[in-house]
């Protein structure tokens, strides 16, 4: 695992670059170079981390409220703890694909956006979650005669109520109500949360499909998003099987 320190400089240190002590690994939006010290020692992350940035209450629960207002989520992880965890593995992999099989509030996707912002990377993340409602919410909805599958029930599920809005808010810099998010990101790469990220997100529903229909080629529309993901998630999704071809963005 690489332990790196990125140096964000407006003016390149020519001497250290010439000596090979530094190398340019990217550019920020303002044109300043992102430099990396050459020859740093490798290290295995420890099992116990301490520091203000790892507070799940301050940078997990309170951040959810900052991005989503009155909406809440139990025990979200610290954004910065998640960011550092991912960086310890993919800091030197700008094209990495990070898969979160139990995404919850979407902290992993948010952390990947921050890593890309820091070094100009093109990392992608796939967040997978169910749309369960909390136990308390389930009881309230049941008393009202609602059940799973009803639109009002589904609207309060974790995916619809927290994950999607949180990812959208992080990218746009605005709450679900359209208000600019207040505050700045801290510790590494500080900038206003309202600036958002130059990222894209698309949301899909996982469904069960008949294998025979897929094999016979009559379920192309249903599996088109998976084919798009498999091809690298670039350009538009070819939703219909028809003669001709489509050009994806390079």
Predicted regions: what they are:
Residues 63-67, 142, 218-222:
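Short intrinsically disordered coil segments
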Residues 3-9, 15-18, 141-147, 179-188:
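Charged, glycine/proline-rich intrinsically disordered loops and linkers
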Residues 75, 79-171:
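Conserved S-adenosyl-L-methionine
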Residues 145-250:
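SAM-dependent methyltransferase catalytic region
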Residues 59-62, 137-139, 212-218:
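Short conserved micro-motifs at the rims of enzyme active sites and ligand-binding pockets
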Residues 54-55, 104, 131-133, 207-209:
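Short, solvent-exposed coil/turn elements at secondary-structure transition points
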Residues 48, 125-127, 203-205:
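Conserved beta-strand scaffold positions in the cores of enzyme catalytic domains, especially
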Residues 3-97, 119, 132-136:
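Class I S-adenosyl-L-methionine
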């Amino acid at each position: 695992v690489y332990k790196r320190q990125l140096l964000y400089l407006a003016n390149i240190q020519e001497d250290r670059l010439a000596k090979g002590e530094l190398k340019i690994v990217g550019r920020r939006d303002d044109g300043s170079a992102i430099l990396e010290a050459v020859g740093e020692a490798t290290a295995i992350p420890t099992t116990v981390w301490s520091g203000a940035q790892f507070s799940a209450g301050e940078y997990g629960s309170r951040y959810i409220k900052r991005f989503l207002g009155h909406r809440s989520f139990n025990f979200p992880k610290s954004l910065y703890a998640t960011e550092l965890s991912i960086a310890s593995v993919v800091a030197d992999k700008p094209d990495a694909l990070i898969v979160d099989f139990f995404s919850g509030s979407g902290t992993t996707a948010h952390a990947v956006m921050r890593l890309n912002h820091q070094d100009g990377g093109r990392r992608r993340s796939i967040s997978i979650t169910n749309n369960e409602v909390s136990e308390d919410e389930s009881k309230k909805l049941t008393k009202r005669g609602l059940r799973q599958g009803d639109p009002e029930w589904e609207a309060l599920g974790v995916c619809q109520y927290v994950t999607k809005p949180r990812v959208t808010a992080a990218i746009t810099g605005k709450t679900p109500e359209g208000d600019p998010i207040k505050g700045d990101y801290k510790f590494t790469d500080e900038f206003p949360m309202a600036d958002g990220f130059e990222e894209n997100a698309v949301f899909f529903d996982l469904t069960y499909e008949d294998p025979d229909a897929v094999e016979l080629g009559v379920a192309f529309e249903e599996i088109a998003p998976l084919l798009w993901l498999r091809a690298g998630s670039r350009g538009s999704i070819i939703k219909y099987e028809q003669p001709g071809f489509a050009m994806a963005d390079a």
